[in-house]
Amino acid sequence: MTTARNMGELAGFAIPRLGMGTMALAIEGRPDRDTAIRTIHAGLDAGVRYLDTAWSYYLPSQPGTGTAEDLGYGEKMVRDALASWDGPRDEVLIATKTGYRRTMEAPNVAENKPERQHLQAVGSQYGWMADSRPETMICDAKESAAHLGVEALDQIGRASCR
């Protein structure tokens, strides 16, 4: 196991030098769950102390609703990886994000201006729909805490693709 190093402090919290994003482990094209958890463990063992996830890291199942069979998949995977890791959990900073919903497809925004911004990942049939209304973000933050199995989030931000 590698000893973690920090960049410095912000508001009394240590900011880790090494971070790992988990989107590719949780959305379309993702590996199986055991492989994803082993990947997170390998990162943590190599000194990663910052894990980035998001409320919207799941596969969509109902167009435009944000409702999915595996809603919370990415955050729950991070929770399970940390629970099964034998390293110092208190040294790991978890950052999550809100502000987007998954959709079954992203319309061509040049042809049709949607009520909210829709984006599409390159090579993906699925899309992302912006939803940063305060009531949505508050609800997502509470759900994220539950998915991650914590009372308080280490860090939450608004997801942005621009």
Describe the residue ranges of each PLM region.
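Aromatic- and acidic-residue-enriched segments that line the glycan-binding/catalytic groove
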Residues: 63-70, 105-119
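N-terminal binding-site loop/beta-alpha segment at the start of enzyme catalytic domains
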Residues: 1-93, 97
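Glycine/proline-rich, positively charged
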Residues: 109-162
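Short, small-residue-enriched loops and turns at beta-alpha junctions
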Residues: 58, 101-102, 160-162
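Glycine-rich, aromatic-flanked loop segments that form ligand/cofactor-binding clefts
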Residues: 89-112
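Distinct, well-ordered alpha-helical segments
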Residues: 71-84, 105-109, 141, 149, ...
